Amino acid sequence: MSKRDYYEVLGAAKDASAQDLKKAYRRLAMKYHPDRNPDDKEALAKFKEAKEAYEVLADEQKRAAYDQFGHAGVNGQGGGPGAGAGAGGFGDIFGDIFGDIFGGAGGGGGRRGPSRGADLRYTLELSLEQAVRGCDEKIRIPTWDSCDVCHGSGAKEGSQPVTCTTCGGVGQVRMQQGFFTVQQACPTCKGEGKIIKDPCGNCGGQGRVQNTKTLSVKIPAGVDTGDRIRLAGEGEAGVHGAPSGDLYVQVAVREHDIFQRDGDNLYCEVPISFVDATLGGELDVPTLNGKVKLKVPAETQSGKLFRLRGKGVAPVRGGAPGDLLCKVVIETPVKLSSEQKELLRKFQESLESGGNRHNPRKNNWFEGVKRFFDTK
């Protein structure tokens, strides 16, 4: 039987935030947890299905692969129904979601410790040329940096954090509620197991300070709007020396005056005179790497597409470049002199004297209109 869509399993939108996904998984896991549904095989199957979906969508890289390629993009990366199906197989993910609810049931009964820094997101606007060729860009990010005075510990110089007496350094306290042992973060130390009695004067005991830092971002050739670049450890600094989060740079490519992009292909409109369209000729067509010659055959109609192979965009993950699609647009002459207008009238008369052979499309259209009204 084919797998259900992971977003459908969790009942979440495809653009759901990490917090929304966590809430959705928590709700389902509470409902179908084996402790609440003993000997219920259907509930266990749904619990495993929700766990598998959340394992993938909670991981930024796995989620990106799933969004692009579906289940094929995350096959073999864990999270299958058979992986960790035993009583101890719910592991880290279950402990992360339910460590503060079910005491030890999910293997997450250890001390939580200081919180990892938050991930940051930054939208970087690029020109089409920058996106196609790649570039190095400098960006400025307002963030939390590790405190230089206490080196992230949060404690005043010469002092150390002390063990929390409420939880004995475990970071969690337990309470009995009916059939369940409820395990919660210690309210005194906020789950860290340590208390800072003499806080650092520079950071107020947080171990981090607000700052604006400048980063250099290497943009690979071929990126497009919506692509993300992950800079590991460049997010917010964690509290009390915890690891920093990551920075995700979101690419946004500005509109171009000439080209439109569709995947690896480029599209542009090429204006030509009706003389060139009628008699044929050669035109200079712009590409991102300079001009090329485009041969226009005689009797070319407006709207005709010409494909210049290999003149598009090289894929960001390697491979042959796309194509440049040139749409010919016949331009009507303007600001004509009296003499030019007279020449055109004579030219029109010569066309009409030749019967239908000079304008077959026009005559076919009028014939179609005539048949349409004749049937009314």
Swiss-Prot record:
Pfam families: DnaJ (PF00226), DnaJ_C (PF01556), DnaJ_CXXCXGXG (PF00684). GO terms for cellular component: cytoplasm. GO terms for biological process: chaperone cofactor-dependent protein refolding; DNA replication; protein refolding; response to heat. Its cofactor is Zn(2+). Zn(2+) 2 binds at C164, C167, C186, C189. Participates actively in the response to hyperosmotic and heat shock by preventing the aggregation of stress-denatured proteins and by disaggregating proteins, also in an autonomous, DnaK-independent fashion. Unfolded proteins bind initially to DnaJ; upon interaction with the DnaJ-bound protein, DnaK hydrolyzes its bound ATP, resulting in the formation of a stable complex. GrpE releases ADP from DnaK; ATP binding to DnaK triggers the release of the substrate protein, thus completing the reaction cycle. Homodimer. This is Chaperone protein DnaJ. It comes from Alcanivorax borkumensis (strain ATCC 700651 / DSM 11573 / NCIMB 13689 / SK2). The lineage of its organism: Bacteria, Pseudomonadati, Pseudomonadota, Gammaproteobacteria, Oceanospirillales.
